[in-house]
C-alpha cells in the first residue's frame, strides 16, 4: 500500500497537471484532447497504471476496513467477495476502454476530432 500510494501520488499529480494546468487548462478538455492523449502509447500506459493502482489500492483499503469492522464471518466474506468482484469488473472495463478507444470514430463531426484524424 505504501509503494502504490507513492506511485499514485506521482501519477495523479501528473494527470492533474497535464489536464488542468498545461496548455489551455480545463477549457481545452474535449473529445479531441482525450483522443489525442489516448492515441499516444505513453498516456495509455500512464492511464492504465493509474487505473490499476488506484483500484487495487482502494480495494485493499476497503478490505482492511471490512476485516477491522465486520465481526460476523459470513458478512465479512460477502463483503470481501463484493469488493474483489467490483474491483475486478472495474479494472476489466476500464482497461477495455483505454485499449479499445477509437480516436477517429466514423461519423463523428470533424470539429470534434483531433487534428491527426482524416477528414471525410
Located regions from the model:
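Membrane-embedded alpha-helical bundles that constitute the cytochrome b-like, heme-associated redox core
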Residues: 1-120
Amino acid at each position: 500500500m505504501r509503494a502504490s500510494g507513492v506511485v499514485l501520488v506521482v501519477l495523479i499529480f501528473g494527470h492533474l497537471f497535464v489536464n488542468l494546468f498545461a496548455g489551455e487548462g480545463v477549457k481545452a478538455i474535449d473529445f479531441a484532447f482525450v483522443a489525442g492523449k489516448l492515441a499516444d502509447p505513453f498516456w495509455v500506459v500512464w492511464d492504465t497504471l493509474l487505473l490499476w493502482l488506484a483500484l487495487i489500492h482502494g480495494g485493499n483499503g476497503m478490505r482492511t476496513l471490512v476485516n477491522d469492522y465486520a465481526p460476523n464471518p459470513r458478512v465479512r466474506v460477502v463483503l470481501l467477495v463484493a469488493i474483489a468482484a467490483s474491483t475486478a469488473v472495474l479494472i476489466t472495463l476500464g482497461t477495455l476502454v483505454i485499449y479499445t478507444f477509437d480516436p477517429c470514430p466514423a461519423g463523428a463531426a470533424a470539429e470534434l476530432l483531433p487534428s491527426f484524424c482524416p477528414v471525410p
